[in-house]
């Protein structure tokens, strides 16, 4: 069933950890979970142009720490930090606690599955030929060091009367191998012919040690991203 399941969920606790990192009792859990959903929704809405790939939420004692992984940190921060202050106030209104927002710059957006999927979806909305968009993304990822990539596009591609699925793959994408570091992203293109779905799998190598934080450590060491600014 490795072909069917979300490869991120399959590897949680093995070489990847959760994007919500906190513990709560039975009475508080539902409330905090809904807060996380609202925080992510409002940040994605406000930061549409900032190429946000991932939002990590941590809750130390009476605080809320939000880490935004973005390919355009300048858009998130805004002029003299004005935009990030607005975001902090909006998140604080939801959580009613002290909020800290950190920004991590993604140095190689071509190797982030979510950003690749969103880029292809945006090109489909601009009526770029879907084969050209897919091939360009595959070539860019392999050139920058990916060991394998697969891209699926489905829907009324090119305005066809009958919906279908097209896919490209280059290199290895071992979905059954649990130690494989596989990034997965999805996006939806809203075209005049209807919606088109985009799925991207990127294989970046194998993580041999059993460490749920291994992928985050790789990113922190500069493999794919680097810290940009801590906003208190």
Curated annotation (Swiss-Prot):
This is Small ribosomal subunit protein uS3. Part of the 30S ribosomal subunit. Forms a tight complex with proteins S10 and S14. GO terms for molecular function: mRNA binding; rRNA binding; structural constituent of ribosome. SMART domains: KH. HAMAP family: Ribosomal_uS3_B. One of its GO terms (biological process) is translation. Belongs to the universal ribosomal protein uS3 family. It comes from the Bacteria. InterPro entries: KH_dom, KH_dom-like_a/b, KH_dom_type_2, KH_sf_prok-type, Ribosomal_S3_C_sf, Ribosomal_uS3_bac-typ, Ribosomal_uS3_C, Ribosomal_uS3_CS. GO terms for cellular component: cytosolic small ribosomal subunit. Binds the lower part of the 30S subunit head. Binds mRNA in the 70S ribosome, positioning it for translation. NCBIfam families: rpsC_bact (TIGR01009). Keywords: Ribonucleoprotein, Ribosomal protein, RNA-binding, rRNA-binding.
């Amino acid at each position: 069933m490795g072909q069917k399941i979300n490869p991120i969920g399959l590897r949680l606790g093995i070489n990847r950890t959760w994007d919500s990192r906190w513990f709560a009792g039975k009475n508080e859990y539902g409330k905090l979970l809904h807060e996380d959903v609202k925080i992510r929704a409002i940040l994605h809405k406000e930061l549409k142009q900032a190429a946000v790939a991932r939002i990590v939420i941590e809750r130390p004692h009476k605080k809320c720490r939000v880490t935004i992984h973005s390919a355009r940190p300048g858009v998130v921060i805004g002029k003299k930090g004005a935009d990030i202050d607005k975001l902090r106030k909006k998140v604080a209104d939801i959580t009613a606690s002290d909020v800290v927002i950190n920004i991590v710059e993604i140095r190689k957006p071509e190797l982030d599955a979510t950003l690749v999927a969103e880029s292809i979806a945006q090109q489909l909305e601009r009526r770029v030929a879907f084969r050209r968009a897919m091939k360009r993304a595959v070539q860019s990822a392999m050139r920058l060091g990916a060991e394998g990539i697969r891209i699926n596009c489905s829907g009324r591609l090119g305005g066809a009367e009958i919906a279908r699925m097209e896919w490209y793959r280059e290199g290895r994408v071992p979905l059954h191998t649990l130690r494989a570091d596989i990034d997965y992203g999805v996006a939806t293109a809203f075209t005049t012919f209807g919606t088109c779905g985009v799925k991207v799998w990127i294989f970046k190598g194998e993580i041999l040690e059993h460490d749920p934080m291994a992928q985050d450590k790789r990113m922190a060491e500069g493999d794919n991203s680097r810290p940009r600014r801590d906003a208190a």
